[in-house]
Amino acid sequence: NDLFVDTVGADMKDAGLLSYFTNMNYDYDSKYGMSLTYRRDASYRFSKTNRWADFWAVSARWNIDKENFMEDSVFNSLKLRGSYGTSGNQRISGSNYFSAPDLASNFFATGTGYAGAQTIALSQLGNDTLKWETVAQADVGIDFALFNSRLRGSFDYYRKETTDLFQSLPLSAITGTSSLASNTGSLHNNGFDFDLTYDLVRGADLNVSLTVVGNINDNYLADLPSETGIIEGIGRNGGPKFERYEVRYAGVNPANGNEMFL
């Protein structure tokens, strides 16, 4: 008997992303500026019904250091800026919108088919309603440099909302699969970023700088269909994205060494 059997496999997918975009910029006297962006994207990852999506952004700035009242100021540069816009995410795998039958076993490999028979198993259920995940973000920030640009940095405050989250929705095992790819819930982030740099030493042959970078972020889930959780890790409305739901540990039982839980 020949224990080696040649196997052949093949796979073909149409893949692509088509985008149209336009951008407009305006500047007045090097003091005030504005930018507008619009784009329209199509992804092969979604069915034809939901393939196209529109996204846009607007931003503005004010170079305060260019104003007359800033003459003789300690600031070498001072800029206030703000923006608001949307963007899309299409990170699902290419086959999540249709059902994909798959061989559960064959004659030349160990399989899970019933009684060793050739079987067909449904590896996933199709969902042709999947659509783009949308991210909307607002940001307000300030950039500055002072004392002959020896001290410089930036501060930013942002709010970010992601809707139509890509998540696996738990299903009953009687469907033949345990989950369904879906757009479920929203994720809200807000926080503060900053960075500061100070030149300790400035010289022709040596420069030494100290930089401090920091971030504070708070996030929570919303619009989930169940208050008792939806996915592994137990995402709950009002709770953070990666919250864990576990039994509280109470230590070790001194009598027998077993773990104890509340």
Predicted regions and their residues:
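Short, intrinsically disordered, charge-balanced linker/junction segments flanking boundaries
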Residues: 1, 256-262
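Extracellular/periplasmic, surface-exposed regions of secreted and cell-surface proteins
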Residues: 1-253
